[in-house]
Amino acid sequence: MAIEIEIPPEWKKFRYRGKTLEELLNMPMDEFIGLLPARQRRSLKRGLTMAQVKLLAKIRKVRQKKLTGKKAIIKTHVRDMIILPEMIGLTIAVYNGKEFIPVRIVPEMIGHYLGEFSPTTKRVQHGEPGLKATRSSMFISLK
């Protein structure tokens, strides 16, 4: 199944396990699965969940209609979907538990999970120590 994608010049040099992007797009799914790392290969060989199948259907629908702008952004909660070559060039908004984080899919992301690009936690930024902030602050004199 050949997929029609406009390939920018900077993507022409990309190779995944020795295969060019055009070869990956024209490759049958079984052959592509063989190129993936063991964890992703096992996951795809076991089959896709209903949610993953629905996401792929949405992706194919957007590709078929060639939508652009806001309508081309696909929202999903499916963080465990492996990025496939047919997703390249799309923007997928991945839910992180609070909001949808837009993720632009580029060739370097092939074989990774969508959830890897939408962090669920923020880095903790502690405030200044004040009264009752820590045990040692009990002995700081009040001004």
From Swiss-Prot:
Record has rRNA-binding as a keyword: yes
Keywords attached to this entry: Ribonucleoprotein, Ribosomal protein, RNA-binding, rRNA-binding
Disulphide linkage map: none
GO CC annotation terms, alphabetical: cytosolic small ribosomal subunit
A biological process term (GO) from this entry: ribosomal small subunit assembly
Single GO MF annotation: structural constituent of ribosome
Pfam families linked to this entry: Ribosomal_S19
Top-level lineage group: Archaea
InterPro entries, per the entry: Ribosomal_uS19, Ribosomal_uS19_CS, Ribosomal_uS19_euk/arc, Ribosomal_uS19_SF
PANTHER family hit by this protein: RIBOSOMAL PROTEIN S19P FAMILY MEMBER, SMALL RIBOSOMAL SUBUNIT PROTEIN US19
Family named by the database record: Belongs to the universal ribosomal protein uS19 family.
Function: Protein S19 forms a complex with S13 that binds strongly to the 16S ribosomal RNA.
Protein name, UniProt field: Small ribosomal subunit protein uS19
Species the sequence originates in: Staphylothermus marinus (strain ATCC 43588 / DSM 3639 / JCM 9404 / F1)
